[in-house]
Structures are given as structure tokens and as C-alpha cells.
Amino acid sequence: MAIAHFSASIVSRGDGRSVVLSAAYQHCAKMEYEREARTIDYTRKQGLVHQEFILPADAPKWVRALIADCSVAGASEAFWNKVEAFEKRSDAQLARDLTIALPRELTSEQNIALVRDFVEKHILGKGMVADWVYHDNPGNPHIHLMTTLRPLTEDGFGAKKVAVIGEDGQLVRTKSGKILYELWAGSTDDFNVVRDGWFERLNHHLTLGGIDLKIDGRSYEKQGIDLEPTIHLGVGAKAISRKAEQQGVRPELERIELNEERRSENTRRILKNPAIVLDLIMREKSVFDERDVAKVLHRYVDDPAVFQQLMLRIILNPEVLRLQRDTIEFATGEKVPARYSTRAMIRLEATMARQAMWLSDKETHAVSTAVLAATFGRHGRLSEEQKAAIECIAGPARIAAVVGRAGAGKTTMMKAAREAWELAGYRVVGGALAGKASEGLDKEAGIESRTLSSWELRWNRGRDVLDNKTVFVMDEAGMVASKQMAGFVDAVVRAGAKIVLVGDPEQLQPIEAGAAFRAIVDRIGYAELETIYRQREDWMRKASLDLARGNVEKALALYNANARIVGERLKAEAVERLIADWNRDYDQTKTTLILAHLRRDVRMLNVMAREKLVERGIVGEGHVFRTADGERRFHAGDQIVFLKNETLLGVKNGMIGHVVEAVPNRIVAVVGDRDHRRHVVVEQRFYSNLDHGYATTIHKSQGATVDRVKVLASLSLDRHLTYVAMTRHREDLQLYYGCRSFAFNGGLAKVLSRKNAKETTLDYERGKLYREALRFAENRGLHIMQVARTMLRDRLDWTLRQKTKVSDLVHRLRALGERLGLDQSPKTQTMKEAAPMVTGIKTFSGSVADTVGDKLGADPTLKQQWEEVSARFRYVFADPETAFRAVNFDTVLADKEAAKAVLQKLEAEPASIGALKGKTGILASKTEREARRVAEVNVPALKRDLEQYLRMRETATLRIVTEEQALRQRVSIDIPALSPAARVVLERVRDAIDRNDLPAALGYALSNRETKLEIDGFNQAVTERFGERTLLSNVAREPSGKLYEKLSDGMRPEQKEQLKQAWPIMRTAQQLAAHERTVQSLKQAEELRQTLRQAPVLKQ
């Protein structure tokens, strides 16, 4: 998971530092240090990914001329030399240097966009120069950002201290009348603002990337987590350690020991209360898997037995609820890990949603028609849509939401709404996660605003509390995490106030991040800006306004009067009519979409629509593409929908595309609208989350605009869903429904006017927690059928487990606690004797089973065999995905007896697993009978393919397990510490090797027998762990580059530092051993030559 490292230092001459040296190091460049007339060369340093040197928008001409036509490193060199020349003091402070960890969850391009966003908002906006570089060391992506401490002026640099200006615009003075000054940059308050700004932007970009992760920059203590903070051992600290070691003192060792003591203390705390790990994870993620748990434990636990015990205790914690079991993906055969959440998180979100529904039913904050009319009179430039949105949020309900893109007029609309509320006697305040967003709300809309954290702090202190005459406006609501959103909703409920949520359409997409905002608006509905401008007919725009105001019946009447509503007796007939009309109206020059609420309807409509196009020859049968939901066929002309965000492709969940080229498992599609069209190449092995896009769900269409829309109405619709479905079009919309089913439920208008639909259409479990969990999972895009089955099965398993308690668990844990000293009084710790030079890797972030699963999923031979299996399923069964789930392949893989029984059943009674393809009987057509014959013929072949796959998987599993265990055994080997005498010998050997005096090197090594034996043992350990000749090549001269990355893979930071320190000694030892082998080989060759010379020769 991402880490929250953000540190700052001042580059000061008093500390022996130079800003030019720092710049050269960070840019991995060669620079001239003009002050000392010397050259600094760091061009051999590796890891530079990206670099930028940026001036603020109002930078003076001299600095622009200074860096004109320079490279990034050249601009940095020129500017910082100018700073060095300007500062005259011997202890001058030259720049502020920030080191910031980047999230590994984002790609390099996403991280660059994140840093640019942060720099623009929090550095350049304050008039500072920003010199930043992106380094991507293995497992440690980070940036270095240097900023100026003086403002730029027209003739150079300004003063470091500036006069403080009061709120009245006047200079602030002390009691004695002196002007009060503050640092222009570099103060503690300034650091805190910049730091908070970084974490706000970081979480914003994680959410944009569809990543369910929130990074909290506060300390563990402030977060309420009972753990000790560990110490960051930076580059400077490690340099001090090396220097101290050369001098024979060990100050840095105390720091490392203190860090290890804190890790041990954290281990003890986790052992006593494993729920601490859940607290850590749930502050970042709402849904997690076992690897997330392992990553947290890996920070604190070294002992493999303790690690496994804690993994078990955490996953089996009563508070943890499994939402989805480990499963096999039908399309690829790859393992999908189990997904978990906590009961507390599920209840928190469910409580928040219930409170939101309760607020929507309380009509206490109405603004009168007269007040609204007066407000609209003063704001004559408001559009009809903005007026409709104001009427919506100024309605009597105590909660409302509005959605619109940037530039859609939200600020203008909120300014007018604020005036209306104030005229009606309400106090209007606002907040946002980011200080910049809250500042914009304050300045542009006139709404008194603070950050959400600031509001929480003030309320905790009893200041500026809400009351029943307050309206709270939350901007960028989609960026707010569930816990924080729940807190604000609860505060509004208790105070009798009203809350208005403002969000962006992208925040409605069904991805894991941002679920709190969706959980609310899915229930209460929202007003949308930029909706009625889509429709080109006046009467359609009027109908859209009616829908926005909740007047569904009026909107339906308008569409009915214009013959746009089609009712058939049965739903199946309505579907047939919809497809027939769609086929008749189909025009490749127009964008079209079929919308339905239920996934099964969408799947059916996609199949039927494509069949019509194939019949007409508009698209061909197409080529096979194995999607995440099974096999599909795509051909040039097909319309597709992307189902997952992918930055590398530039596609988002719900985006529509059109295929222009297709081959097996590869397509080229066009995405974008009009002037923004571009081509996207989709390879199945890299991206498989797509489907035919002729029809899609109403949820996925949120924020979309197309020319023509056809809607299939179902009884699961409500007022909000109807509003979304009937406002996606520009030119035309038609709605189809089955009259009989709607008549039984009060008619079309009554069903579509309902305030909200049922929580869920599933009722697998009457318990409230289970219904809440299903809704929770649905908000995050999980398959709720699988979630329901998983929870029911887990509940049954839990019931059965209670009958067979594990009696020795308590004894084992007690013994473990005694071994770790949990039951004993603290003892004075002493230095460990002969600590290893490089400790072995004893714990791993994933289990052997996890690694095996990953490698099995990537095995090309297994993949090919799985393609045979899935192809046979499609030959045999009418619905292969359903048949595959019925086989319960997880059990087949885990239990040989179960596998045998399933295969026998498959061969004897294939129809018991799923409906076979085709039909038999006198009513079956020739094509259907042929399909049934092919299906029956392929049943034995399917059994054989499955048996072959299981055999191959078992063989591959044994091989991978053996290799992985051998690898883990190898990397767990400790490289022993050397005695002072052995170290001295190897240092002399290294000097001799550097002089190319190898005989002398060997002489040093053989001078003492005991030392030679110690070096041989040391070399044996190095060989067993890293290989006999690994450190002999030229690329092994320095501990850097790909070789170092490979050898340090899986190590903790302190172990990587041990490896760097030990690298020269280990390399020397291997060079010595290699020279010994050469000498020995030459000696043996000479002995052989002498023997051959001395052998008698028989003459004929």
C-alpha cells in the first residue's frame, strides 16, 4: 500500500550543504558549482524517471531569460548558481527540499499528473520556483522538490521576511508599535499547509484512478491507532553511519536499535490486539484481501510462525466479513483472491444511507416561491436548468445533491442558491476536502467555507456548531471517504440542519473509490447540470426539466403525446418491439444506446441487437475475444463498452467505443466524441474488461450523451433512475414496457415516480447486516450474486466450525507469547553477538499459495489448455458461464474426490449441470438439432480436456511450489558477520585486486589458516544465497542497477542497506575465490601436461 512519507529540510551552508550539489544529485546530472569553481558529476546515478523546472506565472523577465533554451537540468544549474551567488552569509539558508513518497498503486504517468497538480496549486500559486525530480527506486517511487525561500523580484530576489497584513488590509503591529514580520516561506505553518495540500491532492488522484485507498498523513496517535511510529533511516543517516563505522564509533547503531525496538513493540501490540491491523487497513481501504493484511504485517513481523498465526487471527476475526471467496475466472482460468470488509464499515455506510433517506423525508427547510422568484429576478442570466437545480436543492428536504462538470455553472447556481437561503433566514456555510476548493466556494459563491477537517475540529471544540437554521454545502463530495461523510451526515441529523452535496459525474461511476457519495445519491436522487442542453427539441427540454423537478408524470405525458412510449402486453413482446425498432432506425453515423436497469436484460439486449446487425451484414461474426465475463466476438463496426478504468489506455468505466479492426484477442477501437476521437488498441492479455455496448445499464450511462436512446422499463425503476435514463439523448428517446406487469403495480407513471426502489432485489438472507453488505458490495462494483452466496456459505461454515473447537490453540498462543516475552517483565536488552552481515529474508508479503496462484495464472501452457476447456464449455452448454459456476470449480481444484465425482456426473448427466445447446424433438429446427448433436459429441471431449487441465495444473503446482520453497530457503540464508581479522584480510585483498596484484591478494588470504577458513565459510554463504559468480561481472562493481534490484527484491529497507554495506566485501570474497579456482585449474593443467611429457612413448 502507499505510504505517507513527507519530509522537509532546509538546504543550508551552515550544515555543509550546497543547493547546486543537491540539484546535481537529484537530476542525476553534471553541473558546474560556480561558487567553488568545481564540477559536480552524478550522471552515473540511476533511477531518474522525470524532471521539471517550473517558474510561477508572474516570474520576472530576468529569470525567464536565465533559463531560456536550457534543458531541465541546465535551468536548475543556472538558477541555483544564481541563488548561491546572491546569498553571502556562511550559514545562509538556500532552499527548502521536500522528499515525498509516491503511491505504487498509480502508474508513472498518473504520478507525474499528481505532482504537477500539487505543484501548480501549492507551490507555483505562492510565487515559488519548483524544481522537482521523480526517482523510481525498486519499491520506492518518490520525488525531490526544491523551492525558493525568497520571492522573485524584478531585479533579483526579495527579503525572506515580509510584513504581516491583517484582515483589514493594514500592516499588523506589535504592542510597541513595531511592524510584525513573518517568513515568506519555510515556516512550520507553511510546511503544514503544503503537507496537508499534498495528501489532499494524493487522495484526489487515487480516487480519479478508481483506487479504493485513502492516505492519512496524520500520526498514528492522532488517528487513534495504538502503534509506535517507526524511524525513517534516510540517506543522510546512513552516510553518518558509514562514517562512524570507519571511525570506530557506533552512534547510528542506537538509532537502528531504537527502530527495531519500536518494531518489536508494535509486534507485541498486534499480538495482543490483531484488530489494530484492521484499523490500519480500513483507514485506507473499504474492501481488502489477504495480501493487504500481509503487507501490513510484513512491516512489523519477522518470525514466519508469528506471521502465519496473525494472518489467521485477523482473517478469522469476528469483525471481518468475507464478501467474495477465492474463485477462478472463467475467461482466463486465473485465481481471483477473496475480498473482505469489516462489519463496522458495512454498518457505518448503511447507517449513513439510512440517515440520508431519513433526511430526504424531513421537509423542514423549504424556500418560498416568492423568495425564489426574487432571486431569479436578480440573476437574470440563470438558465432554466440552473433554476431547476436551485428549486431542487432549495426544496424542503433536509438533504439534496447536485451534479455537474467543471464549467457547467455550478458556482453561479450555488451563489444564487446561497442568496435564496439567506433571504429565507438560513445561515449558509460550506466545506471541502481541499483548502483550494473551499476557498473557491468562499470567494466565488460567497459561502463561508473551511476544509472538512477544520469544521470537525471546530465542532469538537464547541465552536460554529450547526443548528436548524443552517445549510451546509459540501463541495467535491465524491472525494469524501465513507467515514468522514457519515460523520457530517450524522452531525446534520443531530443539529436539525440541512446538507447539500455537490459532485462531479465521474464520481457516480461504479468503481470502489467514492462509494459514500454514490450510496447517498442512489437513494435520494440529484439535480444534474448540462442535461437539457443535450435535447434539441423544445418539448424534450421541457420534459427534462419536469424530470429534474420530480414531475415524472408530466414528462411521461409529453413523451406519450409525441408517440415515444411503446407499451406491449408482455415484457418479452416489448423487448422484441424495441429490438425491431432499433434495427429499423440503426444509423452508423449516429450514436445510439439501449438502456435497462437489470444486468440480465442488458446481456439479452446486447445479444439480440448484435444478431440483427450480423443478419444485415453490417458487422461480421467476428473474432473471439476472451473478456472477463466470458468469450465474446468482435468485428469492425461493433459498439463496445469499457467496464474498468485503465489510465494506460485512457479509458474509463462506462466509456463507449467503436471497433475499427479486430483479430483474435485484439481489437482497435475509436473512443471520444467529434473533435476528441482517438484510437485505442486493446490486447486481451492486458485488458479484458469490456463487452458489447449496444445496451448498457442505466447506472453506467450516468454522465453520458448520445444521439438516440431506447429504454426498457422494468419494475425496479424509480424516479431517480427514470431521470437518468430519459435525459441521455440529444435527438430522440423511446421507452418500452410490458403493460400487464406495470398494470399490476399501479401503472407506468406510478412505478416510475416512486421516490426510491427497494434496497435490493435479492432476498437471500433476512438479516439486516446481509442486506447492508449486499448494498455495500454493489456500490463497489462487486458481483452481488457471488457476494450473497459467499456470505451464506461462510455462515454455514462458521456454524459447523463451532462444533469442533481447536483445543490446543490457546496453549500454542500462550507458548508463543511466553517465547516472545509477553508474560514476563521487561528485561534489559543486550547487544546480540555476531549479528549477521546481511540477514536473510524470513517473512514474505505473500504466502507460497499466493505466489503459486499468480504463477499458475501466468503459465502459457495452462492458459492454452484452459482455452480448450472454456471452448468445450461453449460447444456443450447454452449458457457456459452459468454451467461453469454450477461445476463449482474451486472445489474441483481443491478436492480430488470431488473432482472425480463432478467429472463422472458431467459425462453421465451433462444436463444436470446446465442446459445443453440446441434442442431435440419434432419442434426443433435443423440448426437446433445439429447444435444438440455437436453438444453431445463434445461432452466426453470436455471431460478429457478438464482431466488434462487438472493433471497439468497439479504438475505445474508441484513444480512451482518446489521452486518457490527452494527460492525462499535460499534468500533466508544469513550472510555471517566477519571477524575484524577476516575483514582486514579482505580489505587488503581488495586493495591488491585494485592494483591488479592477484598473487599478493592470494598471499594475504593464505597468511592465516583460521582466517582463510572463516573467509571460505563466508564465501560459501554468499554463493548459496546469491550464486557463485553473481558478483564478478562489471555490472556488479557498485550496488545499483538491475542486479542490485534483483538481489534486494523482497528486502526491508534496513536489509537493503545491509546489502549495500556488505557488497564490496562479498564481491572481494567472490573475486578471491574465482582467482583461487583459476590458480587451481592452471595447476591441474600443468600437472597433466607434465604427466603427459613424462609418459614413455612407444615407437613402431
Swiss-Prot record:
InterPro entries in UniProt: (+)RNA_virus_helicase_core_dom (IPR027351), Bep_BID (IPR041533), Coronavir_polyprotein_1ab (IPR050534), MobA_MobL (IPR005053), P-loop_NTPase (IPR027417), TraA_Ti (IPR014136)
CDD domains cross-referenced by the UniProt entry: DEXSc_RecD-like, SF1_C_RecD
Matches recorded under Pfam families: AAA_30 (PF13604), Bep_C_terminal (PF17841), MobA_MobL (PF03389), Viral_helicase1 (PF01443)
Classification via Gene3D superfamilies: 2.30.30.940, 3.30.930.30, P-loop containing nucleotide triphosphate hydrolases
A single GO molecular function term of this UniProt record: ATP binding
Record-listed ATP binding positions: G404, R405, A406, G407, A408, G409, K410, T411
The keyword RNA-binding appears for this protein: no
Repeat recorded as keyword: no
Lineage top rank: taxon: Bacteria
Sorted UniProt keywords: ATP-binding, Conjugation, Nucleotide-binding, Plasmid
Entry similarity comment: Belongs to the MobA/MobL family.
Protein name from the UniProt record: Conjugal transfer protein TraA
Lineage of the organism: Bacteria, Pseudomonadati, Pseudomonadota, Alphaproteobacteria, Hyphomicrobiales
